[in-house]
């Protein structure tokens, strides 16, 4: 997932493994500003994550992960075990996504009906 973060790309929902755990693309945040980086970096990272979900109208309970641009992935859950599980699934989806994009660069998102069926 760090590869997607470094590239500044959302991780699209291309398959049912993704849809079983995440309701749509996993967003990548915007670049952090110089002020955010030089200020309270950890706090500002959290703020950028929150703003990403708010500005895109996303529900963090439905997409329990984010990619922080030029940094890496963050995942959460109902408890520590759930957060770790979501992080593992995120890594697997990112791995599969990389190959999917290589094989089919113009691959569209999965059908909304299939996303809804699996989520």
Regions found by a protein language model. Give the residues of each.
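Glycine-rich flexible loops
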Residues: 1-119
